[in-house]
Amino acid sequence: MAEKIYEPQKIEQEVQALWETNQTFKATEQEDKEKFYCLSMFPYPSGRLHMGHVRNYTIGDVVSRFQRMNGKNVLQPMGWDAFGLPAENAALNNNTAPAKWTYQNIDYMKNQLKSLGFGYDWDREVATCKKDYYRWEQWFFTRLYEKGLVYKKNSTVNWDPVDHTVLANEQVIDGRGWRSGALVEQKEIPQWFIKITDYAEELLTDLEQLEDWPEQVRAMQKNWIGRSEGVDITFNLSENAADISSFDVYTTRPDTLYGVTYVAVAAQHPLALHAAQTRPELAEFIESCKNTKVAEAELATMEKKGCDTGLFAIHPLTGEKVAVWVANFVLMGYGSGAVMSVPGHDQRDWEFAQKYGLPIKQVVEPSADEPQECDLTTAAYTDKGVLVNSAEFNGLAFQEAFDAIAAKLEALGAGSKKVNYRLRDWGVSRQRYWGSPIPMLNLENGESVPVPSDQLPVELPEDVQMNGVISPIKADPDWAKTEYNGQPALRETDTFDTFMESSWYYARYCSAQNQDAMLDPTQANYWLPVDQYVGGIEHAILHLLYSRFFHKLLRDEGLVNSDEPYKRLLCQGMVLADSFFREDESGKKEWFSPADVDTVKDEKGRITQATLKADGKPVEHGGMTKMSKSKNNGIDPQHVIDLYGADTIRVFTMFAAPPEQTLEWVDSGVEGANRFIKRVWKLTQDHIDALDGDTAPAIDKTALTGDQKTLRRAVHRTIAKVTDDVGRRQTFNTAVAAIMELLNSLQRAPQSTDQDKAVLREAIESVVLLLNPIAPHMCHILWHDLGHKNDIETAPWPAVDESALVEDEKLIIVQVNGKVRSKITVAADASQEEVQALGLAQENVQQFVDGKTIRKVIYIAGKLLNIVAN
């Protein structure tokens, strides 16, 4: 029979059409079958898939297909995280509506996903910008409001004073509005919040349940939640400031209380605003703070600035006066907006005190068993030690002092122990257009009420014109006008943070077509929690934390009965590619696509020379960097599919690096993956006639030769390794390497007897089955070519034959004085005496021990015999 040619484009289109016709990956609940829900983070429909998507979704698809072959009822859905600011920007640039741009992108990217052979149940597809999705989000928000978990308060935003609009952080460039160029101001406006802090302790303690999450992600969430044990302390003012007589601070170091020499408050603290009325320099300082947005992460590195309020607080234990300062490192949104300052034992406070000439007092010294320098003229002493200069608390260590000082404060009515969290409530208001409208109504009396459920969804108009200045729904007064109980009302014109949509999409997939409810609890509880979640570590905190929070809210609404949404998490690494640029006289870099650059490499594959194809002139090599539009070094997946086929991309992305590490996109590696696929194809085609499925004999385990046993052992060791690598360890690269190694063994396999053919057939079928999750198109065809009537998608994962792993014989290395002198084959159960006798009988061994005394014999069972002689 003429050899069948490997034509990836033809094969892949044929197989994909068959999957679609047969609805191969459609999932239904089957109570008698163990389920497996595999989910990859859904993409933002930006226009085209990038290689980061391809890697993410290939991992998810490999896991899904593996679990399906292992008898699980697998759900693997896909959808679109479709709201967000980029659509507004693209709509402006392309003079179109965000909705139209988004839906066009979804159509294109969906075809790309199909062309890569991902086994999704497309009947469960969701797009978060469609009203049948966000209506339930709106409904759920109103339920949270009714439960007291939603509230409205003023919060600071970036305000463009020229365009009179709120800007996202990404729209502020060097402190100016991206469109107007005006200096951005900080402005307080009312916004909606959800009380995630009510769940802070549960979100923290339930991290212990997530044993199959990367430790790094759990640590990041733990730090973000930021549980601390401390003391709330009340400082009275020496004189009332308007109607303010005292204020509270929170500290985790009450042991340093006697070292307080000043207190610092935020620029927006009521005390600061009161004092500024009579102190122009303070008013000016507050104004400068107001127009400088400070992220919490920047506090440690920013320049510390402050201004004296002229007010004094009374130390709660000593009765001494301490100055009240306004400081730019105190944020009103965190804690009470006031901190006690201990410059002797806090480096930030020390730097501030040095700058403004404030007193520095030592109240902690190193313990006797920890000799350390404690020179407060050079830096604060920040370690926990033993108290000094602290009245009756002198000599106490940290925990004793903590408890004793807290008890005294409590007895005086000046403080109490408190557990605090760094986590802040979730502000869900966005002053953008392309998002789900927040389902609240503002009444004439100033009250806010939820939109009645029978009036949901509050629909976002899609046929709009963007002007880049103001949201179309804010610009249209008629859209906001409505009634509530016969009285005039105005709709909320803010939209939800897009993290709202991505916080519960995993659950909607369970009953995506349900028009009558957010979730069907029966379906949701069958599929949830997600067994395997795949996505980038950049989502470790916000998305994954909000999603965990949402799951608990869904549970408390009776919609799901589990505590956590995702059992196992895999965070894939970034995809890197070579980058190339030229720098002009001003230092500005122009980046060129790798496809437009010719390179010369040394013997180690390092680029030594790069020239632009267009003009033949040199360009600089910027190294391997994350594929990005800014560096112009993205590789279009479609180009690789057209060149090599989807299976080649899939094999390369699985083989080139461990999944959690960065993957370097190297053309030679892609070519290598393609050669491997062709080798599998050719080996199978070369042996199809000899391995006819109808006439091939069965393996007779009792009549196998040594070579046949060796080959079967290699096959079943590979099955065991690949099963473990894919299922438990998720080291897909080593799984592919093991299949490659087995393939090398098969190239030399004999096929002269029926048993040779039977063993070889088992081996080749095993290769096809093991490779199927990774290169499913080719394996689908080869499975049929091997004579199988059923599709490989219904074939079980190959089982390990434990008897094949048993070795009848062992190869023993024989050394004399640590140097290899011979190799011998012995029975697997041979004793040390038998091995030693056979080893010493070898001619090459004898010549190195003749005339010498054997001092010692070292035997490592089944592996090595070392004879020590002199």
UniProtKB/Swiss-Prot annotation:
> What does the record give as the reaction this protein catalyses?
tRNA(Leu) + L-leucine + ATP = L-leucyl-tRNA(Leu) + AMP + diphosphate
Name the residue ranges of motif: 'KMSKS' region.
626-630
Placement of sequence motif 'HIGH' region: 43-53
Which GO BP terms sit in this record? Answer: leucyl-tRNA aminoacylation
Gene3D superfamilies given in the database record: 2.20.28.290, 3.10.20.590, HUPs, Isoleucyl-tRNA Synthetase, Domain 1
Q: Which UniProt keywords apply?
A: Aminoacyl-tRNA synthetase, ATP-binding, Cytoplasm, Ligase, Nucleotide-binding, Protein biosynthesis
Q: Which domain of life is it from?
A: Bacteria
* Name of the top EC class for this enzyme: ligase
Report the SS bond pairs: none
| Keyword hit for Protein biosynthesis | yes
Provide the coiled-coil residue spans: none
Q: Which residues does the annotation say bind ATP?
A: 629
Q: Which Pfam families match?
A: Anticodon_1 (PF08264), tRNA-synt_1 (PF00133), tRNA-synt_1_2 (PF13603), tRNA-synt_1g (PF09334)
Cite the EC number.
6.1.1.4
Give any Gene Ontology cellular component: cytosol
Q: Name one GO molecular function term.
A: ATP binding
Family recorded in the similarity comment: Belongs to the class-I aminoacyl-tRNA synthetase family.
Protein name from the UniProt record? Leucine--tRNA ligase
Q: What is the lineage of its organism?
A: Bacteria, Pseudomonadati, Pseudomonadota, Gammaproteobacteria, Alteromonadales
